[in-house]
A protein has these predicted regions:
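Tandem repeat scaffolds
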Residues: 2-357
Length: 357
């Protein structure tokens, strides 16, 4: 590999030349404007890009081991198939930039601002994203084992088919974040803020959400077996067709939450608020509803066999065609055994079918 000086690099960029197969180990490009540069198979190990501007620059198959990008500004920058082990992007600003099939093990992204950044098929083991501002960033099919994303803020971020079981999100906040088919099993999400987040078809078994905010979150089709959901605020959250078997949900807010078709077998809701909760067609055999406030809740067509409703508060709580064999009640005051109008409509429909026969 040949060598180039910083001035020669700048000249080649201005001429539109591709800079390829050169050894630039340890070179200082501090504060340089490398916008529009095209680099292929260049060794930038130990180089210093601090405060540089990389707008619409492309780096392909380059080596960036322990390279310093602190306070760099990347806009529409592409890093593809690069080895960036232990590189440092601390206090960098990354906008609409892409890391594709890059090795980013132990890379530091501390206190960075990321807008529309994409990490696709990257190796991010032990990467450090402490105190990041993520706005519309995307993680796709990347490895995040032991990566640190502590004290970070996520807005409209997407995690697509990610294994997040060993990722550290301590003290982070998530707003409208999408987790699509992700694996979180056994994760510790205590005291985290999740607002209007999507957990569609996720694996959340044994996840600890205690004392977290889950308002307006969507857990449709997700598995939450043995999950810890105590002292949470899950107001107007969606648990449609979710599996909360043996989940611990006591002393929590589920007002306006929707559980249609969910599995709630042996789920513990003791002392929780379930006002206006929609629990139609749930299977809640052996579930615990002791001391719950179920004002205006709808349990139509649910299987509540052997469940415990002692000391629960009912007011216009609908048990329309609800299975209740072996269920325990202190009293049934406030329970509507059926919806008269719906009952009449069902009877009429049954009669019409019989006449056709």
């Amino acid at each position: 590999m040949s060598m180039l000086t910083a001035n020669e690099i700048m000249a080649k960029i201005k001429q539109g030349d591709v800079i390829e197969q050169v050894n630039l180990q340890g070179i200082s490009l501090v504060g340089q404007n490398l916008s529009g540069g095209r680099f292929w198979a260049v060794d930038f190990s130990d180089a210093n890009f601090s405060h540089a501007i990389l707008e619409e620059s492309v780096f392909t198959e380059c080596l960036f081991e322990e390279t310093v990008f602190n306070s760099v500004r990347c806009e529409k920058t592409l890093f593809e198939q690069c080895n960036m082990i232990r590189a440092m992007f601390n206090k960098a600003t990354l906008s609409a930039s892409v890391f594709d099939q890059c090795v980013l093990k132990k890379t530091q992204f501390k206190v960075t601002k990321q807008n529309s950044t994409q990490f696709s098929s990257c190796q991010l083991q032990y990467a450090d994203f402490t105190e990041n501002e993520f706005d519309r960033a995307t993680f796709i099919n990347s490895v995040l084992h032991h990566a640190t994303l502590r004290n970070s803020h996520f807005f409209l971020v997407t995690f697509f088919r990610q294994d997040l079981r060993k990722t550290d999100f301590c003290a982070s906040q998530f707003m409208k974040t999408l987790f699509f088919e992700c694996d979180h099993r056994d994760q510790d999400y205590r005291k985290l803020q999740f607002q209007a987040c999507q957990f569609t078809d996720n694996q959340l078994d044994a996840v600890n959400f205690n004392q977290s905010n889950l308002t307006h979150c969507n857990f449709k089709g997700s598995s939450l077996q043995d999950a810890q959901l105590s002292n949470v605020n899950a107001t107007q959250a969606l648990f449609i067709n979710a599996d909360l078997t043996c989940a611990c949900c006591h002393n929590s807010l589920f007002n306006g939450a929707i559980f249609i078709g969910a599995c709630l077998e042996r789920t513990d809701f003791r002392q929780s608020q379930l006002q206006q909760a929609i629990m139609q067609k749930v299977r809640a055999v052996n579930a615990q509803f002791v001391n719950c406030d179920m004002t205006y809740a709808d349990l139509s067509y649910a299987n509540m066999n052997n469940s415990d409703f002692r000391a629960a508060h009912f007011m216009r709580t609908l048990f329309h065609r609800t299975q209740q064999v072996g269920a325990l009640f202190s009293d049934r005051q406030g329970i509507l055994e059926n919806d008269p109008e719906l009952f009449a409509a069902e009877e009429w429909s049954t009669q019409q079918r019989q006449r056709k026969i």
